[in-house]
Amino acid sequence: MTDFRIYFAGRDDIPGEFILGRDEKLDLLLVALPGVSCSIALHITLEGEGAEVNLGGPYLCPGNERLDISVTMEHKVGGCISSQDFKGIVGGTAQVGFYGRIVVAHDAQKTEAYQADHNILLTDTAKVTTRPQLEIYADDVKCSHGATVGKLDEDAQFYMRSRG
């Protein structure tokens, strides 16, 4: 059975640590809405074979918000799967930082881990810092990470606004 949790940044008390045992599954959605400034720090440990984590969520920072998301995903045993997928829209003078780290231990063979952070900037004064990292000590793994930060040009913004 999958444990599904939704947390709203700035409103909910978000636990800083999750530990998953054998065959446990966790779907974790983090949502940051406009007007919320906060730091979120998560440490997720997969210490039982067959454990699976799906983590991600949207953040919308159109004003002067300050948002930091720090995630450490630690694979201690093999046969586990983790996925991180964050997406942000940042405007105004907002500042967002994403610091993600996947650690795969030497004994964690057959690990599958994915990490992504994708952002759209709406203004020249908005700032996004994104640092996805992989720390892999095992040989037989499937791991990837990536990040994008792009700006919508004025024509694209006009088109979207004119369509509602």
Model-based region annotation:
Residues 1-158, 162-163:
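Conserved beta-strand/loop scaffold segments within soluble protein domains that form the structured core
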